Amino acid sequence: MKLEMICTGEEVLAGQIVDTNAAWFANTLIERGVECQRRITVGDRLEDLVAVFKERSTEADVIMVNGGLGPTSDDLSTEAMALALGVPLVENKEWRSKLEAWFAKNARVMAESNLKQALLPQGAIMIDNPVGTACGFAIKLNQAWLFFTPGVPFEFKRMVKEQFIPFIEEHFPLSEPVSVKKLLTLGHGESALADKLEVIPLPKGVTLGYRSYMPYIEIKLFARGQLAIDSLATIETEVKKILGHSVVAEDITTLDQEIHNSLVNSGFSLSVAESCTGGLIASGLVAFAGSSAYLHQGLVTYSNEAKVKVLGVNPQTLDDYGAVSIATVEEMAKGARGILDSDYALATSGIAGPDGGSDEKPVGTVAIALATKYGVYSQMLKLPSRSRALVRSLGTAIAYDMLRRELLGEAVIVDYSSFSRFSK
């Protein structure tokens, strides 16, 4: 099967918005053994859309078209497809009824322009959109099936998962099995990882890839064919042996997801006191439904006064060691845990930059503590300081990893190779 994607919209073409749908789509499909072989971005011009639909439908077997299904005058994908086919637009009564019901349920008046979203090219198969007002549709042109989906990410992703993937699995079954293993790493750059892992011989059918998204690097082992799949466990073991503690999770996207799952399953509670990370630790967890079951509180105690009055940090500790110190974050973590008697508490304090560093504590210095019922674990690291955002995201990730290791009964303080640790 030859799969392609056409993304529409002037704002995408002009770079005014980042097309995250295309990256997600390609990644989702490759994990199922299907490669997106071409991606084209087209602006909101009717003649350009018609031309690209006609051209690519003679080459591809399946084309995912994303965007241009809204109610406004620059949403032209449906009209362009009708012109490419040489057929009229006809009203889909089922979708019109759903539109009317949706607006009534939400106590809103449906604009006349929304009726445009019930018009489909004659002969099209309507694709349900359970979370939006723009239905999708599928129709064949030349040799290709074209699937039209809205550009709103959560609508697009749900339609892909629930309708597009089942379609291709039914009509274009894979000729051989595939398997994917993902390892999430922390503390190495992409080139450094590649240098370390190039010594591993990869059997036929196995590929090793990297995906960077701050502050992580994801290693992806992809196997096509049963013999290749059978070798994955051995290769995974070798990768973990080489990288050691830099591998922080498996088959998930971020550590906050891992922490969320662990705390929900364990029943333990957490409080957070943040200075340099400014709420990132708590925010990452609150992004997941159900976090109220374990997250007692998230405090951003940025000033020394807040550290003293809210968390009970001893003013003498701040005078003797400074806000960015192991002594201070230990007292912050103890104070945060004690307020609501949480099982665990995380605390951070650091110098995110670009100013504020010194010879003793340069920009990128971050102190992190984890308080438990039995004691406190703490460390102060020198993190890469290319940007303020990087320092904060790395500090957040390391705090998560300390808690993750504690929950697993592993050593909490470990060597991440590329991060240097202060002795005090």
Curated annotation (Swiss-Prot):
Cited SUPFAM superfamilies: CinA-like, Molybdenum cofactor biosynthesis proteins
CDD domains given for it?
A: cinA
Q: Which Pfam families match?
A: CinA, MoCF_biosynth
Q: Which domain of life is it from?
A: Bacteria
Record-linked SMART domains: MoCF_biosynth (SM00852)
Note the InterPro entries from the entry. CinA, CinA-like_C, CinA_C, Competence-induced_CinA, MoaB/Mog-like_dom_sf, MoaB/Mog_dom
User: TM spans, by residue?
Assistant: none
**HAMAP family to which the protein is assigned, alphabetical:** CinA_B
Q: Which family does it belong to?
A: Belongs to the CinA family.
Name recorded for this polypeptide:
CinA-like protein
Supply the source organism for this entry.
Answer: Shewanella woodyi (strain ATCC 51908 / MS32)
